[in-house]
């Protein structure tokens, strides 16, 4: 049984959050929203604040999940990240980067693979 896209995305974000916690990241925010857009996960990795876009798919039939992150989407994430940085007044305290996490599910959702792409894009 397939879930709707929102459920798939939410499930993938939970998998991604667990994955990065187990990798030593500290999650600061999930689903940070503002008028400019949304960032799936904001986390701290040593001296970096990391803005993470999570893409979840059933397989690679339409290409890799990260290929769905267009320049327009990257720009939206960047602008949202800028607002977050200003709101939290952290611009002089950390380095910043943009990561992507790909979650590939099987048709039963019982098995999955996770791929972390550090510094996936820069604006």
UniProtKB/Swiss-Prot annotation:
InterPro entries for the chain: Restrct_endonuc-II-like, tRNA_endonuc-like_dom_sf, UPF0102_YraN-like
Q: Which GO terms describe its molecular function?
A: nucleic acid binding
Q: Report the leader peptide range.
A: none
Q: According to its UniProt record, which protein family does this protein belong to? A: Belongs to the UPF0102 family.
Question: Sorted alphabetically, which NCBIfam families does this protein's record hold?
Answer: PRK12497.1-3, PRK12497.3-3, YraN family protein
Q: What is this protein called?
A: UPF0102 protein CLK_1817
Q: Which organism is the protein's source?
A: Clostridium botulinum (strain Loch Maree / Type A3)
